[in-house]
Amino acid sequence: MAEFPASLLILNGKSTDNLPLREAIMLLREEGMTIHVRVTWEKGDAARYVEEARKLGVATVIAGGGDGTINEVSTALIQCEGDDIPALGILPLGTANDFATSVGIPEALDKALKLAIAGDAIAIDMAQVNKQTCFINMATGGFGTRITTETPEKLKAALGSVSYIIHGLMRMDTLQPDRCEIRGENFHWQGDALVIGIGNGRQAGGGQQLCPNALINDGLLQLRIFTGDEILPALVSTLKSDEDNPNIIEGASSWFDIQAPHDITFNLDGEPLSGQNFHIEILPAALRCRLPPDCPLLR
């Protein structure tokens, strides 16, 4: 087979007992591919391993985990300076794998690993919040964010994305919409938001298409707001088609400013960030990512 440059796999510590993954790595090594493996146990590990990857001269750093792991690795990559910055490869091993699913990464580990090593590296956008925190997929706010951040880890491990629905139903009586004001390029809205989705990618929360028109290389963020004064009626209205739904507000901009009279929480690729003021902007062509040729999120 053709020779490929070396890669470094940054593996979330929760996936170390994945026997099929070990077998896939061993098989590719036997075929002549050089794959270094490092395991993360705490925040900051991914950034250190990206630095090591640059010293090793690898062509690809593979994020092995869920959306949070992809976020950590991609954030570390865009902070690199100089030439020969490795491309991002994706190996979906998390609970929801929203970004990997939406860009078309294969579910089979061996196929995903080969794509992460040998796929075409395409320049894609990332987003940044308040000039600090980044996300590659989506920022979600509202009651859905509170559900995903509060759902017990054991429930997520046992039931996957279904756990979010169960926990949400259990909390229905305590959840309230968030009052806020959102501005962007040729966009202004103020009111009660049930759910806010600001997407570089399209889906979050285990497959929910919050921003179905988003592309990862168009220099824009897609905004979708589900509005409503009461949770249950607004939830029922989301079952209608988009054209018939007065509770859906949409917009597109390279930046959005969000202000609220009280603290609201956004979920950035799985990591919560709370505050009253948010400036979210796109970072065009921030990194290269190895993607399938038919990736639906490319223009």
Curated annotation (Swiss-Prot):
GO-annotated biological processes: phospholipid biosynthetic process
Listed InterPro entries: ATP-NAD_kinase_N (IPR017438), Diacylglycerol/lipid_kinase (IPR005218), Diacylglycerol_kinase_cat_dom (IPR001206), Lip_kinase_YegS (IPR022433), Lipid_Phosphate_FormReg (IPR050187), NAD/diacylglycerol_kinase_sf (IPR016064), YegS/DAGK_C (IPR045540)
Residues covered by the DAGKc domain: 2-133
GO cellular component entries: cytoplasm; plasma membrane
Gene Ontology terms, MF aspect: ATP binding; lipid kinase activity; magnesium ion binding
Cofactor descriptive note: Binds 1 Mg(2+) ion per subunit. Ca(2+) may be able to substitute.
Cofactor: Mg(2+); Ca(2+)
Gene3D superfamilies, alphabetized: 2.60.200.40, Probable inorganic polyphosphate/atp-NAD kinase, domain 1
Broadest EC class assigned to this enzyme: transferase
Active site: E271
Domain of life: Bacteria
Localization in the cell: Cytoplasm
EC number(s) recorded for this UniProt protein: 2.7.1.-
Principal location listed in the UniProt entry: cytoplasm
Ligand binding (Mg(2+)): L215, D218, L220
Amino-acid positions noted as binding ATP in the UniProt annotation, renumbered to this chain: T40, G66, D67, G68, T69, I70, N71, E72, T95
Key words of the record: ATP-binding, Cytoplasm, Kinase, Lipid biosynthesis, Lipid metabolism, Magnesium, Metal-binding, Nucleotide-binding, Phospholipid biosynthesis, Phospholipid metabolism, Transferase
Recorded coiled-coil stretches: none
Family: Belongs to the diacylglycerol/lipid kinase family. YegS lipid kinase subfamily.
Task of the protein: Probably phosphorylates lipids; the in vivo substrate is unknown.
Protein name: Probable lipid kinase YegS
Native species: Escherichia coli O9:H4 (strain HS)
Gene: yegS
